[in-house]
Amino acid sequence: MLDGPLFSEGPDSPRELQDEESGSCLWVQKSKLLVIEVKTISCHYSRRAPSRQSMDIQASYWARGPQSRTCRLRPGSPEPPPRRPWASRVLQEATNWRAGPPAEVRAREQEKRKAASQEREAKETERKRRKAGGARRSPLGQPRPEPRNALRAAQPTGFPVFSRPERFGQVGRAPRPSVLPQGDPGVAWAGPWGGRRPGPPSYEAHLLLRGSAGTAPRRRWDRPPPYVAPPSYEGPHRTLGTKRGPELSRAPTSSAPVPATTRTEGGRTKKRLDPRIYRDVLGAWGLRQGRGLLGGAPGCTAARARPESCKGAIEKSSGLVAAGLNSAGDSHSQGKTTGGPGTDAALSRSAISSPPRPVPRSRQHLRGSRKGKEGSEQIWLPTCWLASPKKPPVRHSQTLPRPWAPGGTGWKESLGQREGAEHETLEVWKVTRRAHTLPRISRGPAGREGIFVIDATCVVIKSQYVPTPRTQQGQLVPSGESCSVSDSLSQPKPCHEEEGEGAAANPSVCQKRLLSSRVLNQPSEGRECEAEVGQQGDSSLEERSSSGLGFPVGEVNPRDAPTQPGSQEHPTLGPAAPVCAGSLKGSEAAGVPRRAGGGWARTPGPYAGALREAVSRIRRHTAPDSDSDEAEDLSVHSGSSDGSDTDAPGASWRNERTLPALGNTRPREGGKTAGLSDSIREIVDVISQTEEGFIREDTRKTPQGNRERE
């Protein structure tokens, strides 16, 4: 499931990879600069599901119907959506969620379910009341006998407690899966199908429905379970945190305090997932160590304590739970109070440790604020999670897939001893296991029930710069200029002035070749060719030159670079070219640090000014052809062409442009007027002038260069 294109997680995606490499990237996109890896780890582990069931999310456990203990489908629950094979793995399914049976059918079913659950709950509540002494029931104040109403009130509250009293009520008896009062039509959480929800179910609901908690025991639970696409966003999308407004509002029926708690918990002060998500989908991972469910209740500890009661000391459990609930509930008495009967039910249920049934999230929220939750949350813990004192958790039935499981070794041990050393266990556990790897509840699922789902998508976006390949530094320009590339650009290569001029005269060929060959290092050609090349491939040349020369882009040929915004590496050429351009000028130019542009850390090549000038012209495509006037203008332009140069992203070329502007301006002014040869000569002159005015201009222009560069 981790393999394959991000969006084609479908049947076509490489299954073997998915199966074999759960760790492989779901989707990797690489470009020169960006590597995006999307890794999705989705682990679904359903202990409760009958082995025979294959794990297809579509066979959601609710779809499974009553058999799906996990889902706790009520017999009346709407028919399961047609099972969709896992094969269709889509990140976003067109319809992951079913509207469910028609509203009336749903309502009817829900009513039936509700009635049944209420009756059962009434009975349970009575029993619990008797057992627990009605510790919490009184707060409700509603006669439990009237379970229907009380239940109703509680249910609106979203107290799963009420809906699942039976669960706690009988230790031995597993609560009827179908009983969940979820169906309460009024209940917002009626269920994706039952809820009158126009939109896709919340992701939690979606997971539950999709069988995200696959009902079938994972065939290969060493591997993460298949990916469950989020519900489609065709309708208003309920996110996990959606308020169960209706429930909350109804919750007050059971008791105002609960709503307060709900407010806290369900009211999104704290976003809590449906308890079932914690219990079934998230499995142990959903339980936070010290705190019960992911929701963050200390319920865990309470749950831990509960296992003993689970043994069958329902009463004791009730006491424990009551104590826990009371402590929690007391701390959040409102929530607890709200759940008076519910609390009892919860206690008995918790004690029963019967497999949890899905419950409206609100319930959990109502269940309480953290503290309250602590007691309540246990309720959510599937029995299997509570290490049954009687039977050690099945080693392989750990909630987590083996590879990631904290480890069969320590895990079970820690959990196993839980009974006596509940807290200590947790402590030990924490110590021994890394927090992030250990299941949130240190309680190994003893039974088949429960679903373990880890759905983690990790998107790694690495921005890595892939430098362009460096070119050989020593390429000679074949254009007849036989200047050997000067490895150190700054070292003025005493090219013959005539040669330099010749190069300038043949700048197209020379520079093209130079730049093309990235022989920016060749001083004379570097300079002359640079001018030519500047036009042709300023950016590429600059890059190449910087690569070949090994200079910083800005350093190579600032003048060159300006032609192309991208020609930041041309600036690297700049120094090299100037070296070639004129040794004489080079010395002067060398004397002048090319700091003006701020582009080069090192001193500019001897002919940096001239080169920059040439490059500027090249970039501007305004090389003075035969017109010295034009050349002068160009020099002016080169000064003024900063804008265009500025366009270039590279500061270095900007600097060089600025420098060329300086150089050009002066050189142009003082440049010889002639044909192309003159232009070359002019370049040489410019170099000399550039050196003179370069310092001046440099000083003057440096700010500009810096500005441009920046």
Curated annotation (Swiss-Prot):
It is found in: Cell projection, Dendritic spine membrane; Cytoplasm; Endoplasmic reticulum membrane; Perikaryon. Residues 113-131 are annotated as: Nuclear localization. Two forms of 81 kDa and 89 kDa are expressed in brain. The 81 kDa form is the only one found in kidney podocytes. One of its GO terms (molecular function) is RNA polymerase II cis-regulatory region sequence-specific DNA binding. The keyword Cell membrane applies. Residues 186-236 are annotated as: Interaction with MAGI2. The keyword Endoplasmic reticulum applies. One of its GO terms (cellular component) is plasma membrane. Its main location: membrane. Keywords: Cell membrane, Cell projection, Coiled coil, Cytoplasm, Endoplasmic reticulum, Membrane, Nucleus, Phosphoprotein, Postsynaptic cell membrane, Synapse. It holds the Pfam family Dendrin. Residues 360-370 have a biased composition (Basic residues). Residues 407-708 are annotated as: Interaction with CD2AP and NPHS1. Residues 1-22, 62-195, 213-274, 324-375, 390-422, 469-508, 521-710 are annotated as: Disordered. Residues 105-127, 265-274, 693-710 have a biased composition (Basic and acidic residues). InterPro entries: Dendrin. Residues 341-435 are annotated as: Interaction with ACTN1. Promotes apoptosis of kidney glomerular podocytes. Podocytes are highly specialized cells essential to the ultrafiltration of blood, resulting in the extraction of urine and the retention of protein. Forms a ternary complex with MAGI2 and SH3KBP1; recruits DDN to the cytoplasm. Interacts with MAGI1. Interacts with ACTN1 and may interact with WWC1. Interacts with the podocyte slit diaphragm proteins CD2AP, NPHS1 and NPHS2; the interaction with CD2AP and NPHS1 is direct. The 81 and 89 kDa forms are detected by an antibody raised against a C-terminal peptide arguing for alternative N-terminal sequences. This is Dendrin. It comes from Mus musculus (Mouse). The lineage of its organism: Eukaryota, Metazoa, Chordata, Craniata, Vertebrata.
